[in-house]
């Protein structure tokens, strides 16, 4: 590194986006310097006010080293009315396999949910990222809103399907339907990288148990909660007016269908919306410290893989009186689930 300019030819110099060090560049590589990096984010994010120049910074980092390390700075950024995007890379407790408890983030969305100016999204597919970034830039530049978007993105390779029709509004509001069925007896909510496990669990429910599940992709539990809370507040203060319903309540209006929600974060993330979901609601999450393991073993350890989702769905239906309770024990045996395995939060 040389502060007056790059003195060598990088190995990727033939590529369009090759590594380069220049004084007037647009990419700052701050290294392991969280305080300096977030300060650069704040400087760029307040440029619209301090210098009259709209700059929309994208601060990209290991998601564990964002709110966990610099939440005080992020809070200060909100106080200074900064604008921009925080991108937590390698996010989720089970997607970053092999790096142990220091790196596996399962709780940054709790911190984001508690920060008033943060709009937090846990994204599963590339089209969701495109929609959210476009909407965020529209809010910050065109509508001049003082908001910061927090996006968690993962490092796991899987097939990205085409965007369903009319999904854009739901992606922004926090939830959209990804698979329909004529008469669902169960509702599955998935988030981020665990959408793949939810889809596979739905296939097992259909093939092994003749249970049809409607599937929803949740892009933001916190945005769903905030809108539902605002609707409830308005209804509280306007009892003489027509009562409002949130996006969540409009879409999930069948009281007879139990819901199982799954995310790669602690249960409290998906439990945010429990008071506003009609019918029984059960959350699966990754409570506990991370571990150095494969994705498959991590998801089984934290009880969020397809087999635990199936078991949770069967239990939800059994408790609702829709199927026999003996089906639960059948599922435990069929999928070789150890009833005596340690609880993940105690290990």
Give the positions of each predicted feature:
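Hydrophobic, well-ordered secondary-structure elements that form the walls
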Residues: 41, 112, 125, 188, ...
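Short hydrophobic beta-strand segments
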Residues: 57-58, 152, 184-191, 260-261
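Hydrophobic alpha-helical bundle architecture
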Residues: 47, 243-256
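Long hydrophobic segments that form regular secondary structure
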Residues: 138, 146, 168-214
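Generic long, charged, amphipathic alpha-helical segments
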Residues: 41, 174-182, 186-187, 202, ...
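Short conserved micro-motifs at the rims of enzyme active sites and ligand-binding pockets
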Residues: 97-100, 162-164, 227, 271-274, ...
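Thiamine diphosphate
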Residues: 1-161, 167-171, 217, 222, ...
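Peripheral docking tails and interdomain loops at the edges
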Residues: 12-18, 119, 126-127, 254-347
């Amino acid at each position: 590194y040389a502060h007056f300019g790059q003195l060598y030819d990088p190995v990727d110099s033939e590529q369009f986006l090759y590594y380069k060090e220049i004084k007037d560049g647009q990419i700052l590589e701050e290294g392991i310097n969280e305080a300096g990096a977030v300060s650069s984010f704040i400087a760029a994010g307040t440029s619209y006010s301090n210098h009259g120049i709209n700059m929309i910074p994208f601060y990209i980092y290991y998601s564990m080293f964002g709110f966990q390390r610099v939440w005080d700075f992020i809070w200060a950024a909100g106080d200074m009315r900064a604008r921009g995007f925080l991108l937590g890379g390698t996010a989720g407790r089970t997607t970053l396999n092999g790096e142990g408890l220091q790196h596996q983030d399962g709780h940054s969305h709790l911190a984001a949910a508690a920060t008033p100016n943060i709009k937090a999204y846990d994204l599963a597919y590339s089209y969701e990222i495109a929609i959210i970034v476009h909407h965020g830039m529209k809010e910050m530049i065109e509508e001049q809103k003082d908001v910061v978007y927090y996006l968690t993105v993962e490092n796991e390779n899987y097939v990205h399907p085409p965007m369903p029709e009319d999904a854009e509004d739901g992606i922004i509001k926090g939830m959209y339907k990804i698979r329909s069925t004529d008469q669902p007896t169960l509702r599955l909510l998935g988030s981020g990288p665990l959408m793949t496990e939810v889809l596979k669990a739905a296939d097992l429910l259909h093939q092994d148990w003749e249970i049809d599940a409607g599937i929803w992709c949740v892009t933001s539990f916190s945005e769903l909660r905030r809108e539902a809370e605002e609707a409830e507040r308005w209804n509280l203060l306007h009892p003489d007016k027509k009562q409002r319903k949130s996006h969540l309540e409009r879409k999930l209006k069948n009281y007879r269908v139990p819901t199982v929600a799954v995310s790669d974060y602690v249960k409290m993330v998906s439990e945010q919306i429990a008071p506003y979901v009609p019918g029984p609601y059960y959350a699966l999450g990754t409570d506990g410290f991370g571990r150095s393991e494969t994705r498959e073993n991590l998801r089984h350890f934290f009880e969020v893989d397809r087999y635990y989702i199936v078991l949770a769905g069967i239990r939800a239906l059994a408790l609702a009186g829709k199927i026999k309770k003996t089906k639960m024990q059948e599922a435990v045996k069929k999928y070789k689930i150890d009833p005596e395995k340690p609880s993940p939060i105690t290990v």
